[in-house]
């Protein structure tokens, strides 16, 4: 999912948990999002710049160490809205074979805070609710000439389109995102059956995230 669509405040820390992935037809179960998980941390370096890193815990269970590290930069903002860029580096290492790969990624998202509720502080505590929607594009780049199976790599640029919603209540933020993954590539003749809004092109994805702002 998109990381820190709305950057943290300067000096703020946050912990994040993510669940979800491409939607697949699983025999005997049905159509469900793949239960991929990550845990992560974010830090507001500046008012418009947040640094983050995430550990992919599901991959770890299968002997692959995978992390993504990057930044969320708000390049444009107006009252209740903004545009953020998320340059990210994804790295994976197979603990059994020693094979490793990396994939650069660049996301761009527009967000809009369509509802906001604040109450005056009482006994030192105030109450805040913010509702936001966002939409954007994710660009995944595969710089390798050959795939891990030895075949020629024909998918150097892998775009995806996402829409999402953020619910913030004080320090807690809940995020839901729906994604159209790789809509320009065929989803035929592969091991997993991926339903898609574009027939035999791409796949759909669903993600849920929770993060807590420590300060």
Q: Where are the predicted features?
A:
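Short coil turns and loop connectors of transmembrane beta-barrels in diderm outer membranes
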Residues: 9-11, 47, 77-81, 116, ...
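Flexible, solvent-exposed coil segments and beta strand-coil junctions
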Residues: 44-50, 82-91, 141-146, 187-188
């Amino acid at each position: 999912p998109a990381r820190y669509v709305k950057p943290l405040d300067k000096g703020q820390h946050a912990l994040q948990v993510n669940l979800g992935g491409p939607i697949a037809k699983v025999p005997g179960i049905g159509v469900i999002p793949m239960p991929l998980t990550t845990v992560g941390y974010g830090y507001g370096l500046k008012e418009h710049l947040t640094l983050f890193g995430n550990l992919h815990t599901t991959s770890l269970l299968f002997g692959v160490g995978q992390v993504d590290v990057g930044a969320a930069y708000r390049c444009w903002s107006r009252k209740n809205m903004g545009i953020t860029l998320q340059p990210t580096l994804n790295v994976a290492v197979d603990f059994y074979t020693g094979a490793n790969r990396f994939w650069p990624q660049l996301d761009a998202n527009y967000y809009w805070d369509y509802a906001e509720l604040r109450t005056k502080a009482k006994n030192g505590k105030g109450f805040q609710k913010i509702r936001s929607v966002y939409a954007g594009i994710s660009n995944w780049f595969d710089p390798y000439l050959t795939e891990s199976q030895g075949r020629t790599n024909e998918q150097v640029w892998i775009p995806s389109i996402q829409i999402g919603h953020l619910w913030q209540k004080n320090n807690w933020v809940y995020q839901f995102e729906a994604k159209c993954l790789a809509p320009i590539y065929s989803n035929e003749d592969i091991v997993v059956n991926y339903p898609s809004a574009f027939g035999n092109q791409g796949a759909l994805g669903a993600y849920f995230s929770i993060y807590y702002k420590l300060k």
